[in-house]
Swiss-Prot record:
Places the protein is found: Host nucleus
Keyword Endoplasmic reticulum: no
HAMAP family registered for this protein in UniProt: HSV_HEPA
Principal location class: host cell
Name the UniProt record assigns to this protein: DNA helicase/primase complex-associated protein
Gene Ontology CC terms, in alphabetical order: host cell nucleus
Length: 748
């Protein structure tokens, strides 16, 4: 069969179409956006088979999916001149279809990764890719991003939004989704006065800008041409052996291969309305590409992270990021290393990129045998996960306890739990690559790795349980190695620990000697951990080896519990060498209180003084906090905390009157406690209220009281530990108490 050859890198994969090829088999045409060796972009096409049963298994909560059902969904999403909301109500099915198709594509063409050069081979009579192999001179490139900003002001009937919100399942009160449901059901006036759809796409060489009052009418303002940013191309592909080739159309980006949207200036619906306009103009006849997006707005309970994943048209990946350069760099890094799957596909990202098909019974059985053999090889005692079913959390310190000296090192394993999984499944080279990148200090990979392991119990429970067993066995081996060096592990929390050497008083050990001892200890503990995995018959993929990091050498420590402690290196001075874990700081007031307590702790340990002096300093610090709170008593952002949408019941009626502000209600919901009429303060979500926000009086005291109580409790514990350390068997002469009621008149 005649073939053509070219070289380029895959920059994006989008769904083009899907149709039934049997009761349980769907054919999916994929469009691969490729940057060719000449620097220009082109579209390549691949045809794969997807099992409908597999889609059903992945789409948890979706009803049984058939191939005919997938064809119906694809046809609806490709219909020109329709609102681009075909994915609403079917997001789980679309996610499962995309992941299944992407995995099938990798199996058909050979494994590929975004922005990695490949030798592309396609048959000339079908126009379809048949392989994407790594050439001998392969080299990585970097994504070329355009910047997208969009905004939407659209009239949607408030009563329809309220009805959609009321119809949502328990824990599914996302107001952004309620607005989308009202739009889908015909309750949006697309030509109402005051409507605005704004769209701006900027590349290194061009700017495309439009403002519409009515998306169906010519724009009010314009700059640039569509041809400046996208080229219209036609291709011939043969999707069935005996059928004639069909013409498929695509937009190919000019001088960019991905889009970065500023999260603070981005409306996915505004962008989709503009894309729908282009879609209708391009696909006047012939097969049309699916048009749809995935985002937290489609989830009844919202999601923690913001994203906008373009399933199909216009075929270019979109990354939602903060405006600062560091965040964009980290998000693009995660985008490239996960082939665009993060964060949209959550717990499934690295499974989709890996070799194991969890829908294949034989493959799962093989992995389960490997897991069972590894667990059987672990030493008895403390390695079965029964004592610590989520990983070891322990402390030998009394509560509270205080220590000082130059030898309090802290260590932790980089990407610990994903690394242990990578030992069980060393074939998953993409996971190993992400672990290596995280170990090299690339922070953009951390959220995806945390989510991967957090969801592993739902994807493959035996693997999760095995990882926990390995983690606990490693913890036991690390402690034995530490004890052999006369080091006491004071606190061990899942992937890290801190403690002290017992062969000399810490305060008399020179810092250089303490540092050398800590580094030698790190090496011993690293070797002990590696020995556990080798004994279990496990070996990692290259780049996914265990890595125990030395996190610092501290001079002072105060511990209240395993998950609540303060470490400080006085040689660094101030807050620079400080690690403070466990203080409640959900609001800006809480964060201020945490800084105040840290300052009091530094004062107490660095310059020994009478407890009464520390208590007086604490009273002054709390007075300063109260005065700052008074000055910002009406500042909603100062008092604001967040809670998941799923934790809310019915929201106040006023929260549904924010119009376009509701579009942002798809993640953790910001709220403040406000004063009720002769009742306890209650939480009020303020993010969807029209600006300027007019609230009932903020219940400042309700926000402050628990924070100040915890400050006093933790400080008194530290003072008690200090007194005991100095050899005083009696409690401190004076405990710190702060009477917030003395200031009630300020907040009345």
């Amino acid at each position: 069969m005649p073939v053509s050859h070219s070289n380029g890198c895959v920059c994006g994969v989008s769904l083009y179409s899907a149709w039934a090829a049997g009761p349980d088999r769907a054919r999916v045409l994929l469009a691969l956006l490729c940057r060719m060796d000449d620097g220009g972009c082109d579209a390549k096409f691949a045809l794969v088979n997807v099992c409908a049963r597999g889609v059903t298994a992945l789409a948890r909560g979706a009803r049984d999916v058939t191939a005919a059902r997938l064809e119906d969904l694809a046809r609806a999403a490709a219909a020109p001149r329709a609102l681009p909301l075909a994915t609403l109500g079917h997001a789980a099915t679309w996610k499962a279809l995309y992941v299944s198709a992407l995995a099938a594509c990798a199996r058909r063409l050979g494994p590929f990764a975004f922005i990695e050069r490949r030798a592309l081979e396609e048959t000339t009579d079908t126009g379809l890719l048949v392989s994407a192999e790594e050439p001998p001179d392969a080299a990585d490139a970097a994504p070329r991003a355009a910047v997208l900003r969009s905004a939407l002001r659209l009239a949607v009937e408030e009563d329809a939004v309220r009805a959609a919100a009321a119809a949502a399942p328990a824990g599914g009160g996302s107001l952004a989704r309620a607005r989308l449901c009202a739009m889908r059901d015909g309750h949006a006036d697309l030509s109402a006065p005051g409507n605005v759809v704004e769209f701006e796409l900027t590349t290194k060489t061009a700017r495309f800008y439009r403002i519409f009052a009515d998306i169906a009418q010519p724009p009010r303002k314009r700059a640039g041409r569509l041809a400046d940013v996208f080229a219209h191309r036609e291709y011939r592909v043969r999707t069935e052996g005996s059928a004639a080739p069909v013409v498929v159309r695509a937009l190919v980006p000019v001088n960019f291969d991905c889009v970065v949207a500023d999260a603070r200036a981005f409306s996915p619906m505004a962008a989709m309305l503009v894309f729908a306009q282009w879609h209708a103009a391009l696909f006047t006849d012939g097969p049309a590409q699916v048009l749809g997006f995935l985002g937290p707005q489609l989830n009844p309970g919202g999601e923690e992270r913001d994203y906008c994943f373009l399933l199909g048209f216009p075929g270019v990946p979109l990354v939602v990021s903060a405006a600062d350069a560091g965040a964009v760099r980290d998000d693009l890094d995660a985008h490239v290393l996960t082939d665009g799957l993060w964060p949209a596909f959550g717990v499934h990202v690295y499974h989709a990129l890996g070799p194991w098909n969890f829908l294949d019974g034989a493959a799962v059985a093989s992995l389960n045998r490997r897991i069972a053999a590894a667990r059987a090889a672990l030493p008895p005692g403390g390695s079965d996960g029964s004592d610590w079913p989520a990983g070891r959390v322990s402390t030998i310190l009394n509560s509270p306890a205080r220590a000082r000296g130059s030898g309090w090192p802290r260590f932790d394993f980089s990407a610990f739990f994903p690394t242990l999984y990578a030992h069980l499944v060393p074939e998953n080279a993409r996971l190993a690559r992400a672990i290596c990148a995280r170990r090299d200090g690339r922070p953009g990979l951390k959220p995806s790795l945390l989510t991967f392991f957090g969801g592993l119990r739902h994807v493959h429970a035996p693997a999760y349980e095995a990882v926990i067993a390995l983690a606990n066995a490693v913890a036991a081996a690390v402690e034995r190695a530490a004890n052999a060096r006369n080091f006491a592990v004071c606190t061990y929390v899942k992937d890290g620990f801190w403690g002290a050497f017992g062969d000399a008083a810490p305060e008399v050990v020179p810092r250089e000697a303490a540092l050398a001892a800590a580094l030698a200890l790190r090496d011993d503990c690293q070797r002990a951990a590696e020995a556990v995995l080798r004994a279990a018959g496990l070996h990692p993929a290259e780049g996914a080896e265990l890595h125990l990091r030395f996190e610092g050498l501290f001079t002072h420590a105060v511990s209240w519990s395993a998950n609540k402690y303060w470490l400080w290196d006085a040689t660094a001075g101030g807050a620079e060498g400080e690690l403070f874990v466990g203080f409640p700081c959900r609001t800006e007031f809480g964060r201020m209180a945490k800084r105040s307590l840290a300052g009091l702790l530094r004062r107490a340990v660095a310059q020994p003084e009478r407890p009464s002096d520390t208590v007086a300093a604490a009273a002054a610090a709390c007075d300063a906090l109260v005065h700052a709170a008074f000055e910002r008593r009406g500042d909603v952002r100062f008092w604001s905390a967040t809670a998941p949408i799923a934790d809310w019941g019915a929201v106040p009626r006023s929260a549904l009157s924010g119009g376009d502000l509701l579009d942002a209600d798809h993640g953790p919901r910001p709220y403040v406690l406000v004063a009720g009429h002769e009742a306890a303060p209650f939480p009020l979500p303020w993010g969807s209220l029209p600006l300027p926000v007019l609230l009932p009086d903020i219940a400042c005291r309700a926000h402050m009281a628990p924070v100040l109580q915890e400050l006093a409790r933790m400080l008194n514990g530290a003072l008690a530990a200090l007194a005991a350390r100095e050899g005083d068997d009696e409690p401190p002469i004076e405990e710190f108490e702060y009477n917030l009621a003395d200031f009630d008149f300020l907040f009345a």
